[in-house]
């Protein structure tokens, strides 16, 4: 890299094992960096951040079953935790890829926003946060799950033959109370997504794709810019669910 190059650094446990998560200047390993695409501003890259990198990996994992897309005119994918960072971006990316998206959110006040991102159908979180049947009616060709727990178990029971579920979070619960039925009867694939240590080559590709799949005019409505001095107070409010 040369002085003045636009770069992005997400993941690699920076701010956790390495200092520099929130700072004006940081010293990091060169292999942690990705060259920022010319059609992506510094602010836009941080609006996306780790959530955007995770969301696009989830969306591409679900889309990986190309034979499904060739066989059906309409592909149905469910996204849990759709009001969150990863979930909302996954809704937008999947919609851009031509996929029919069902969004799951416990915040009814966000339903109109999710529709503006491209969600065709909406489900309340409470409808899925219950004990799951071993198999239920096949409703979806794939899923992006950001919450885990009972919600993921219910999603798995509703996936159609050969569907793919990309799982990346545990906000509901880290335990998964399911059976082998979705896997051995319908051939469902559960694909774990970890964007923290994604290879540099893969990151370069994904960051190059993100600007083409994101409508920042919509995302920026949910963005609030704060100063470094406001971090602690903002974190406290987030933990209180405000």
Features from the language model and the residues they span:
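Short amphipathic alpha-helix with an adjacent loop that forms part of the alpha/beta core around
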Residues: 128-138
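Glycine-rich phosphate-binding loop and adjacent beta-alpha segment
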Residues: 17, 150-216
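C-terminal hydrophobic helical "lid"/dimerization subdomain
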Residues: 201-242
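Mid-domain Rossmann-like dinucleotide-binding core that forms the NAD(H)/NADP(H) cofactor-binding site
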Residues: 46-125
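Local beta-strand N-terminus motif with an aromatic residue
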Residues: 23, 119, 139-141, 183
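Glycine-rich phosphate/adenylate-binding loop and adjacent beta-alpha elements
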Residues: 1-35
